[in-house]
C-alpha cells in the first residue's frame, strides 16, 4: 500500500509517497525528534504530517489519536535506554570476577542516569507516560529484566547477596530515579566533572545493601570508601 500527501484547504502539502509501514515509521521518527528537543508537547500530528510530506488524514490512518503516537515515542525511548545499558556494560575484562560483576551493575545504573542527562526532554516524555500506558510499561520493564540479569551474574560471581531482586532494591532505585529526575527536570547541573563524580559515588553508596563481603571489598578497593562517604556527608 502506498500513501501520499494531498492538497488541503489549509494549503498544499508537497506529495511524498510512502509504503504503509514506512509512513508510520516516518511519523514516529519525526515525533521522536520533536520530543527530544521540546518534550511531549511538541508531538502534534497535524504539524508532523506536512513536515514529512503527507496529509493529516494519511497520518491519522496510523494513529487513532495523539496519545497513541506519544506512547510510541515513549516506548522507543525505553528501547534506546536498554540499548545504552547493554553497551555500557560491555567493558574491558578485569581479573577479579567480583569486581567485574560490581562494575557491570554500576555502569548499568550510571547509563540510566546518563540517558536523562543526554535526553532530558525525551526522558520526561517516557516518565510522564509510564503509568497510564501498558505499551510503555512493557518496554520499561525491559530495563528491569536487563538489570536483573546483571544481578544474577553478580550473584554467581559472589559480588551480590543470594536472592537479590533488583525491583526490591529501593536505595539503589532511589539513587537512579532521583539523579535522573534532577537531570530531566533541570533541578541541578549534571554535566560538570564534580556532578559526574558525585553521581558515581552516590550509585556506589546505594549499592551497598546488595553486596556480599567480597563485593564490599572489591568496591572499596576500586572506589575507596573514604571518597564515597566523604561525598555522602557520612
Question: What is the meaning of each model-derived region?
Answer:
Residues 110-114, 155, 205-209:
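Helix-loop "lid/cap" segments that line or gate small-molecule binding pockets
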Residues 30-38, 80-91, 175-182:
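Solvent-exposed, amphipathic alpha-helical segments
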